[in-house]
C-alpha cells in the first residue's frame, strides 16, 4: 500500500465509519479521520484493513459543499487524486482534490461496493434476488390490493372492489343491503386506488356515531391509519398570538370526520376545500336530504366537496323506492352533468323496469314473449340482439342457448342506465345468511326501580328513556348503588350462561358503566369469565378483550359491550346475542344484531331480550317484533315507519299499562311494513343485481385469492426476511407467531412493525376469529415495506461465495449479475402493471459465456458456501481486473434481453389500454353514464404510458463473485 496525506480510504472492517481521510503518516502507522462519524483510527502501515477509494471517468461524485458532478478526467500528484468534474447543477467544469469529496459519500453501485470492501453475506444477496422476483410478480398480479384484507372472501364484495377499484377517479354509489359489507367494499376500492398510487389524500365523512367504527375497520381490516378530526384537534393548530397559520387538514393525508360537526363549522369546510383531497367517502348517504328547491345543509356540504374531489364513493343502504327524489340527488352528486333533470331520470328508470322483467325470464330459462323481445330491442341495437334471439328461438343445443342467453344479459348490463355508478346486492340475491330467532324473557320489575322512578318523578328529574335503562336511573339517586344485587336480569343471565357453558355469548348494554358493573357482578357471584368492551377503552385494549372472547380454550364465555363500543366489530363465531338494554330505535337495533348477523355467520342467531313486565321495554319489543318483524329479519324500512309513527308510539311508551288501541297500532304497522316490503321486492332491479353480484367470475376471483393464502413461497420468504432483517420470532402455536424488533437489526427501522411487536398469522380464518392477530399476505405492509426495504437499499448488492464443484478447476471465476429493467414515470400511470422492476440474471464465466439458462439460481445456490470477509476482500482484490472486464461485457449482453422486455411491455400496454378505451368508447354511445372525462383520461393514460415505456432503462442492481474449489 502507498499512503499519502489527503487520500480517501474505506475501512474494510467498519464500513459504517464512512469515507476516511489520511491526516498523518509516520514510519509504522497511518492515521485516518472519518469525519462523517467523527471517529479517528490509527492502523499499522503494513497490515491496515483499508481499501483505496478511487473514482472512474463517468462516476458521480458529491462535493462537501452539497453539489454533485460527473468525472471527466483524473490526474494524480504525489499520490493524491485530482478529479475534473462537470457540475450537474450548472454545467461548470471544475477540478477538485479528493479531500473535497463529501464525507458522507456512499457507494450504491454494486461494483463500487464490492471494490470498497462493502461486501454482503451470501444469504443477503439471495434475499435481494428473491425480493426482486417477488416484487415483479406482485406488481403484475391481478389480485393485488384484494388479497390482504382481513375479512372473508365474499365474491360480490370482491367483484365490486375489482370493478370499481381499477377505474380512474371512480364515482359510485354503493347501496348493498345491511350486512352485506359496504364498508369492506369501500375499503377494498380505496386499497386498490392507494396501491396503484391513483389517490393519496383521502377524506371519509360519516355520522358522529360511526367515526370509531370506520377508524377500527380501516385499521384492522386494511392496515390503513386514519386520523379522527374534530374541533378540539383543529383548534390545536390555531394560535392567535402566532403569525404562522396552519391548515389542520394538511397535517394528515387520511382523515375521518363527522358530518354534523362540519355542518356546524363552515370554516372547517373551507379548510377542507383548501387542503384538497383525491378521494371522498361518505357513509350513510341517505341522510343527505334533497328536494328540488330545498336541498339540506348536509347535501350542499357534500356537493361542494364532491365538485372538487375527483373520486367519490357514497354508501347507503336505503333503496331508491323509499325516496326516488333523494336517490336521484345522490346520483347527481356523482355526475351532475348526467343527472341534471329529475323528471328525465324518472322516465328513464321506468324504461328499464320492463327490461328487468325480461331478464327474469332469461334467468329462469323461460321463452321470451313478444313484448319482452320488443323491450330488449328498444335498449339494444338490432345487430346485437337479433342473432342472439334467433339462437334462443331455434333448436340449438342447450349449451349454445346458455351462451346466447348470457351474452344477451351481459349486453343489457353494459347498457343499463346506472350500472356503472350504482351497485346494489340484496340478501335475497346473495343468500347464505342465517335465520334469526327472537326470545323474549319477561321479568317482574323490582320494587327498587319502581320506587326510584317515583322519587325522580317527584323531583322532576325523570327522563323519557329512564325506563329503558333502569339501572342508570337507579344510580341517579346514588351513583354507588349496587343495582345488580336485586336486578332479576342478572340472575336470568347467570342461569342462561350455566345452561350454555360451551356457547359464546355477546351481551350488549346501552352504557359502558352497565357493562363494567355487570362484569364485576358476574365475577364476584359466579367467577364467570367475561371480557368487557366499551368506548372508554383504547383500540389496543378492545383488541385484547376481543381476543380473550375469541379464544376457544381458556377464553371468555361472554363479551359485555356497550352499544357504541361494539361498533366496527363483528363476532360471527358467537351465535347468542343478549340485548341487556333494548335499543330505542330500529337502526340501533339492527346495528346490534349486525354484530353477529353478517355474511359469513354459519349458525342461526338466537336473540334474547330480558325486559320488565308492564314497562316501555315490553311495549317497544312487541312493536319491533309484531309490527316491524325487526328481530327476525332485516328491516330496511324500519326507521321510515319509526319516524312516521313516533308520536303515536311515544304515547304508548310513556303509559305502558294503558294500551287501548295498541293492538290496532301494531297491526297497522305490520300492514305498512308488508306493503313496503312488497314494493321493494317488486322494484328489485335484477339487472342491477346481476351486475353488482359478479356471478361465476366473482366466485373464481374468491377461489384464486384463497389459493394464494399462506402459500409455502410466502411463508418461506417472510420468515427469511424476518431472520435477515433482525426480527425476533416466537411460535405461539395455533398457526400464529409473535414478532418483535431485535436489538441487532440490520436496518434502523422496519416500517409497519410497531415497537411493541405484533402477533401474526398466515391463516385468514384465524385472523378473523382473533382481532389481535394480523393476517400476513403479499399485500400486508410488513411484506410490501420489507421488499421495498431490500430492493431500494444496499442490502445484498455485492457478495462473494465459494462454489464447491469437483468438476471445475479450483479458482474458476464466475460472475453472477442481476440487472433490473424499469420505467420512471408518474405514479398514476400504473406502469408497473406492464413493466414492474424486472430482474434479468446473467451468469458469466471467465470467457464471457452466459450460463444463466443452463444453471438456475436455485441449483447454483445449493452448491455455494459462505466465505469470510477478510478472505472475500482478498479474492476481490486478486480478480478485480477480471470483474471489471466481465461487468463491461455484461453491459453489451444485457441490451437485447432488456429491449425485448421493454418491447413486450409496450405491446401489453397498447393492447390492454386500447381494448379498455375501445370498449368504453363503444359503450358511451349506448350508455350515458360513461363520462367523457373518463374516456379522455383513459386516452391520455394510454398515450403517456406508451411514451414513458419508450424511455425505460436498465441498471446493474447487484452482483456476486463466485470462485470454485474442490471442497
From Swiss-Prot:
PROSITE patterns reported for this sequence: HELICASE_ATP_BIND_1 (PS51192), HELICASE_CTER (PS51194)
Name of the protein in question: RNA polymerase-associated protein RapA
Keyword DNA repair attached: no
Domain of life of the native organism: Bacteria
Organism: Pasteurella multocida (strain Pm70)
Positions of ATP binding: 176-183
E.C. numbers: 3.6.4.-
Reported function: Transcription regulator that activates transcription by stimulating RNA polymerase (RNAP) recycling in case of stress conditions such as supercoiled DNA or high salt concentrations. Probably acts by releasing the RNAP, when it is trapped or immobilized on tightly supercoiled DNA. Does not activate transcription on linear DNA. Probably not involved in DNA repair.
Family: Belongs to the SNF2/RAD54 helicase family. RapA subfamily.
Record-linked PANTHER family: DNA ANNEALING HELICASE AND ENDONUCLEASE ZRANB3 FAMILY MEMBER, SWI_SNF-RELATED MATRIX-ASSOCIATED ACTIN-DEPENDENT REGULATOR OF CHROMATIN SUBFAMILY A-LIKE PROTEIN 1
Keywords (A to Z) from UniProt: Activator, ATP-binding, DNA-binding, Helicase, Hydrolase, Nucleotide-binding, Transcription, Transcription regulation
Any one GO MF annotation of this record: helicase activity
Entry's Gene Ontology BP terms: regulation of DNA-templated transcription
Quaternary structure (record): Interacts with the RNAP. Has a higher affinity for the core RNAP than for the holoenzyme. Its ATPase activity is stimulated by binding to RNAP.
Lipid biosynthesis keyword on record: no
HAMAP family given in the database record: Helicase_RapA
Pfam family, one: Tudor_RapA
Placement of sequence motif DEAH box: 283-286
Signal peptide: none
Every Helicase C-terminal domain range: 489-660
Helicase ATP-binding domain mapped to chain residues: 163-337
Amino acid at each position: 500500500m502507498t499512503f499519502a496525506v489527503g487520500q480517501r480510504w474505506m475501512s474494510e472492517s467498519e464500513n459504517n465509519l464512512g469515507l476516511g481521510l489520511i491526516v498523518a503518516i509516520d514510519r509504522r502507522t497511518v492515521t485516518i479521520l472519518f469525519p462523517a462519524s467523527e471517529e479517528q483510527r490509527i492502523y499499522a502501515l503494513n497490515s491496515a484493513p483499508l481499501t483505496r477509494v478511487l473514482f472512474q471517468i463517468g462516476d458521480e461524485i458529491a462535493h462537501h459543499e452539497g453539489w454533485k458532478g460527473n468525472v471527466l478526467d483524473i490526474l494524480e500528484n504525489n499520490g493524491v487524486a485530482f478529479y475534473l468534474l462537470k457540475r450537474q447543477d450548472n454545467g461548470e467544469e471544475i477540478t477538485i482534490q479528493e479531500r473535497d469529496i463529501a464525507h458522507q459519500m456512499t457507494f450504491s453501485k454494486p461494483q463500487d461496493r464490492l471494490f470498497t470492501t462493502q461486501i454482503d453475506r451470501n444469504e443477503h444477496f439471495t434475499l435481494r434476488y428473491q425480493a426482486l422476483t417477488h416484487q415483479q410478480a406482485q406488481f403484475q398480479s391481478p389480485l393485488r390490493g384484494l388479497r390482504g384484507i382481513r375479512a372473508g372472501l365474499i365474491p360480490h364484495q370482491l367483484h365490486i372492489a375489482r370493478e370499481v377499484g381499477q377505474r380512474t377517479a371512480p364515482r359510485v354509489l354503493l347501496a348493498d343491503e345491511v350486512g352485506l359489507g359496504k364498508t369492506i367494499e369501500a375499503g377494498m376500492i380505496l386499497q386498490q386506488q392507494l396501491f396503484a398510487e391513483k389517490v393519496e389524500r383521502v377524506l371519509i365523512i360519516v355520522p358522529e356515531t360511526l367515526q370509531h367504527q370506520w377508524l377500527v375497520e380501516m385499521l384492522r381490516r386494511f392496515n390503513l391509519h386514519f386520523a379522527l378530526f374534530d374541533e378540539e384537534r383543529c383548534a390545536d393548530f390555531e394560535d392567535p398570538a402566532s403569525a404562522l397559520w396552519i391548515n389542520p387538514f394538511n397535517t394528515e393525508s387520511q382523515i375521518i370526520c363527522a358530518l354534523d360537526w362540519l355542518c356546524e363549522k363552515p370554516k372547517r369546510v373551507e379548510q377542507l376545500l383548501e387542503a384538497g383531497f383525491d378521494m371522498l367517502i361518505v357513509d350513510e348517504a341517505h341522510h343527505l336530504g334533497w328536494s328540488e328547491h330545498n336541498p339540506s345543509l348536509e347535501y350542499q356540504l357534500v356537493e361542494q366537496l364532491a365538485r372538487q374531489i375527483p373520486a367519490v364513493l357514497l354508501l347507503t343502504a336505503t333503496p331508491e323506492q323509499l325516496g326516488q327524489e333523494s336517490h336521484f340527488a345522490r346520483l347527481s352528486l356523482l355526475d351532475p352533468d348526467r343527472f341534471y333533470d329529475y323528471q328525465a331520470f324518472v322516465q328513464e328508470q321506468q324504461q328499464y323496469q320492463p327490461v328487468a322483467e325480461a331478464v327474469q325470464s332469461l334467468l329462469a330459462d323461460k321463452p321470451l314473449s313478444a313484448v319482452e323481445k320488443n323491450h330488449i330491442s328498444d335498449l339494444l341495437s338490432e345487430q346485437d340482439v337479433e342473432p342472439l334471439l334467433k339462437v334462443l328461438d331455434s333448436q340449438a343445443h342447450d349449451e349454445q342457448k346458455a351462451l346466447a342467453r348470457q351474452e344477451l344479459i351481459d349486453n343489457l348490463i353494459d347498457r343499463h342506465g346506472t350500472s356503472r355508478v350504482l351497485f346494489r346486492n340484496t340478501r335475497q340475491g346473495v343468500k347464505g345468511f342465517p335465520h334469526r330467532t327472537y326470545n323474549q324473557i319477561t321479568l317482574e320489575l323490582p320494587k327498587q326501580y319502581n320506587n326510584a322512578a317515583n322519587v325522580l318523578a317527584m323531583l322532576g328529574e325523570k327522563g323519557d328513556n329512564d325506563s329503558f335503562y333502569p339501572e342508570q336511573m337507579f344510580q341517579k339517586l346514588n351513583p354507588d348503588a349496587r343495582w345488580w344485587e336485586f336486578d332479576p336480569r342478572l340472575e336470568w343471565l347467570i342461569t342462561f350462561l350455566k345452561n350454555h357453558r360451551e356457547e359464546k355469548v355477546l351481551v350488549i348494554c346501552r352504557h359502558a358503566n352497565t357493562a363494567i358493573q355487570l362484569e364485576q357482578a358476574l365475577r364476584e357471584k359466579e367467577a364467570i369469565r367475561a371480557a368487557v368492551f366499551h368506548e372508554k377503552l383504547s383500540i389496543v385494549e378492545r383488541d385484547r378483550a376481543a381476543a380473550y372472547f375469541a379464544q376457544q380454550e381458556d377464553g371468555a364465555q361472554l363479551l359485555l359491550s356497550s352499544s357504541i363500543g361494539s361498533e366496527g366489530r363483528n363476532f360471527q363465531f358467537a351465535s347468542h346475542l343478549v340485548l341487556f338494554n333494548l335499543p330505542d330505535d330500529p337502526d340501533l337495533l339492527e346495528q346490534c344484531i349486525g354484530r353477529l348477523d353478517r355474511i359469513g355467520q354459519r349458525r342461526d342467531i338466537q336473540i334474547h331480550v330480558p325486559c320488565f313486565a308492564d314497562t316501555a321495554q315490553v311495549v317497544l319489543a312487541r312493536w319491533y317484533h309484531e309490527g316491524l318483524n325487526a328481530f327476525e329479519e332485516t328491516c330496511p324500512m324500519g326507521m321510515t315507519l319509526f319516524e312516521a309513527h313516533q308520536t303515536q308510539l311515544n304515547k304508548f311508551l310513556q303509559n305502558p299499562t294503558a294500551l287501548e288501541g295498541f293492538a290496532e297500532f301494531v297491526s297497522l304497522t305490520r300492514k305498512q311494513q308488508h306493503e313496503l316490503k312488497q314494493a321493494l321486492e317488486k322494484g328489485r332491479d335484477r339487472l342491477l343485481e346481476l351486475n353488482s353480484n359478479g356471478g361465476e367470475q366473482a366466485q373464481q376471483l374468491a377461489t384464486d385469492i384463497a389459493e394464494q393464502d399462506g402459500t409455502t413461497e410466502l411463508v418461506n420468504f417472510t420468515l427469511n426476511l424476518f431472520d435477515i432483517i433482525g426480527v425476533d420470532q416466537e411460535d405461539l402455536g395455533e398457526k400464529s407467531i409473535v414478532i418483535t424488533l431485535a436489538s441487532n437489526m440490520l436496518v434502523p427501522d422496519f416500517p409497519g412493525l410497531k415497537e411493541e411487536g405484533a402477533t401474526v398469522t398466515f391463516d385468514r380464518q384465524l385472523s378473523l376469529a382473533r382481532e389481535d392477530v394480523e393476517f400476513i399476505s403479499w399485500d400486508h405492509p410488513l411484506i410490501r415495506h420489507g421488499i421495498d426495504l431490500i430492493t431500494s437499499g444496499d442490502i445484498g448488492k455485492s457478495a462473494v461465495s465459494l462454489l464447491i464443484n469437483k468438476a471445475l478447476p479450483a479458482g474458476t471465476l464466475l460472475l453472477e449479475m442481476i440487472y433490473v429493467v424499469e420505467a420512471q414515470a408518474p405514479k398514476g400511470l400504473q406502469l408497473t402493471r406492464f413493466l414492474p422492476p424486472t430482474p434479468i440474471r446473467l451468469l458469466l464465466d471467465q470467457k464471457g459465456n452466459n450460463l444463466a439458462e443452463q444453471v438456475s439460481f436455485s441449483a447454483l445456490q445449493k452448491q455455494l458456501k459462505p466465505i469470510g470477509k477478510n478472505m472475500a476482500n482478498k479474492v476481490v482484490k486478486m480478480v478485480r481486473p477480471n470483474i471489471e472486464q466481465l461487468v463491461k461485457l455484461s453491459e453489451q449482453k444485457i441490451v437485447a434481453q432488456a429491449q425485448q422486455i421493454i418491447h413486450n411491455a409496450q405491446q401489453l400496454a397498447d393492447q390492454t389500454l386500447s381494448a379498455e378505451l375501445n370498449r368504453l368508447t363503444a359503450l358511451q354511445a349506448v350508455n350515458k353514464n360513461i363520462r367523457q372525462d373518463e374516456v379522455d383520461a383513459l386516452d391520455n393514460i394510454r398515450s403517456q404510458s406508451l411514451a414513458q415505456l419508450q424511455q425505460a432503462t436498465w441498471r446493474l442492481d447487484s452482483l456476486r463473485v463466485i470462485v470454485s474449489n474442490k471442497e
